């Protein structure tokens, strides 16, 4: 069965940033398609980068409005993947970093699609947004990784997101790395491979 791993990069980055992770993911490369698109908008603060939505003020209201717009951009990407690769959503895992992981979680919780998994790396959502969502009844598994030394997105957001998911009876695993900043550590990669170990 074909597997799709969809990477969603962070703010100011591009699709090339995360695609190299495929070399560390223990999936049969012949059976797996790794897809890492650029976000739809040029980044305001990085000429060579892209953004899923603006982050000028970094306020909750800006985040809410940005996620609403980005939702439809991601929807088009996923619809195209399902059509072009003749797969259903259970054959898709979404790995997001920072802004990309916020979008992945936001999208998955509201869309009635059972993805194989949603992997959030250093970018969970605050309670102010989680509590406003209209949650779909889905069976997607969530893996939430965050470094405790992160000075860009506070790690307590990962704790909040995991608690929220557990309260809604989702399958969720929280992994905190004491020695990791706003990055992806070997511990995160190990956890991803554990999650994928029994992906048939």
Region annotations inferred by a language model:
Residues 16, 151-157, 185:
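Conserved alpha/beta-hydrolase "acid-adjacent" motif
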Residues 143, 159-200:
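C-terminal catalytic histidine-bearing segment of alpha/beta-hydrolase fold enzymes
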Residues 143-146, 150:
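Short beta-strand/loop motif that positions the catalytic acidic residue
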């Amino acid at each position: 069965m074909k597997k799709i791993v969809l990477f969603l990069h962070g703010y100011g980055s591009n699709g090339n940033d995360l695609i190299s992770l495929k070399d560390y993911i223990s999936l049969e490369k012949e059976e797996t398609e790794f897809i890492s698109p650029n976000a739809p908008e040029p980044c305001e603060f990085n000429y060579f980068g892209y953004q899923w939505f603006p982050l000028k003020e970094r306020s909750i209201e800006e985040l809410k409005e940005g996620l609403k717009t980005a939702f439809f951009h991601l929807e088009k990407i996923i619809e195209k993947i399902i059509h072009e690769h003749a797969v259903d959503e259970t054959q898709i895992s979404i790995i997001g970093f920072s802004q990309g992981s916020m979008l992945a979680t936001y999208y998955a919780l509201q869309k009635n699609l059972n993805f194989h998994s949603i992997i959030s790396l250093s970018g969970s959502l605050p309670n102010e947004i989680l509590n406003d969502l209209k949650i779909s009844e889905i069976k997607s598994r969530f893996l939430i990784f965050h470094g405790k030394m992160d000075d860009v997105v506070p790690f307590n957001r990962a704790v909040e997101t995991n608690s929220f998911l557990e309260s809604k009876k989702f399958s969720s695993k929280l992994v905190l790395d004491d020695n990791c900043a706003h990055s992806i550590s070997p511990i995160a990669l190990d956890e991803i491979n554990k999650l994928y170990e029994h992906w048939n």
